């Protein structure tokens, strides 16, 4: 196993993370849509829909009151909507990019209906960015791209031909093995994915915790995951 990076029980959604007031206003098979309570006297008419990575949680944008993109946006007059992805299991092995695109399109239309705005601003992070890029292509094909006023991408690799750390693990045999395992299990286990990301930056994400928390005794609750 690998050394743990955090104490798992130190965080609780709604108390120590994701504390910004909001409510689920829409739900479909793949996601929930959260609308946050305004934090400014006036708000812009056009809403912002944030699409997090499918392999992460929505509260990466709302870690704490002092470290929250959501609160920053709200205090600057934006109407913020956030997607919270469902954790898939073996029943959802057939979900593909088109499934996620259709789910985001539904959520986007709910944002428009709630706010009365003809269009929305989109922000996608990592795989969420790939999803909104595909959504834009889908809408362009239907001649409905005007429903999106702007799109912002955070660490979204749109050209897979470019070299990146991920290509170290992306030879044809490895990809085929990953596909077979994912289909057999129904999903790619999050722990397996975490190991891949950790070995991309071993000094920061593996040996740092091994040395400081175990060898130097910085964390007596040190465990291997």
Residue ranges of each PLM-predicted region?
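Short, surface-exposed "cap/lid" segments of acyl-processing enzymes
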Residues: 2-89
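Secondary-structure capping and boundary motifs in well-ordered enzyme cores
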Residues: 25, 41, 65, 96-100, ...
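Active-site proximal loops enriched in glycine and acidic residues that flank catalytic Cys/His/Asp
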Residues: 37, 52-53, 84-87, 104, ...
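Amphipathic alpha-helical segments in well-structured domains
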Residues: 66, 70, 97-104, 132
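Alpha/beta-hydrolase active-site loop
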Residues: 92-115
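Alpha/beta-hydrolase fold nucleophile elbow
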Residues: 111-127
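Alpha/beta-hydrolase-fold enzymes
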Residues: 117, 131, 136-225
């Amino acid at each position: 196993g690998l050394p743990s990076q955090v104490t798992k029980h130190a965080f609780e959604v709604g108390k120590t993370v994701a504390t910004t007031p909001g409510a689920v206003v829409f739900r479909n098979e793949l996601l929930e849509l959260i609308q946050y309570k305004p934090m400014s006297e006036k708000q812009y008419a056009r809403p912002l829909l944030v699409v997090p990575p499918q392999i992460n949680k929505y509260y990466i944008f709302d870690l704490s009151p002092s470290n929250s993109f959501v609160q920053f946006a709200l205090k600057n007059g934006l109407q913020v909507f956030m997607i919270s992805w469902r954790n898939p299991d073996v029943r959802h092995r057939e979900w593909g990019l088109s499934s996620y695109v259709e789910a985001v399109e539904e959520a986007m239309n709910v944002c428009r209906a709630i706010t009365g705005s003809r269009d929305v601003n989109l922000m996608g992070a990592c795989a969420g960015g790939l999803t909104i890029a595909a959504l834009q292509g889908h809408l362009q094909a239907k001649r409905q791209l005007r429903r999106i006023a702007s799109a912002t991408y955070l660490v979204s690799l749109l050209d897979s031909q470019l070299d990146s750390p991920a290509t170290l693990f992306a030879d044809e045999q490895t990809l085929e093995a990953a596909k077979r395992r994912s289909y057999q299990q129904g999903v790619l286990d999050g722990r397996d994915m975490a190991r891949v990301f950790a070995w991309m930056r071993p000094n920061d994400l593996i040996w740092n915790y091994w040395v400081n928390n175990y060898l130097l005794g910085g964390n007596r609750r040190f465990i291997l995951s």
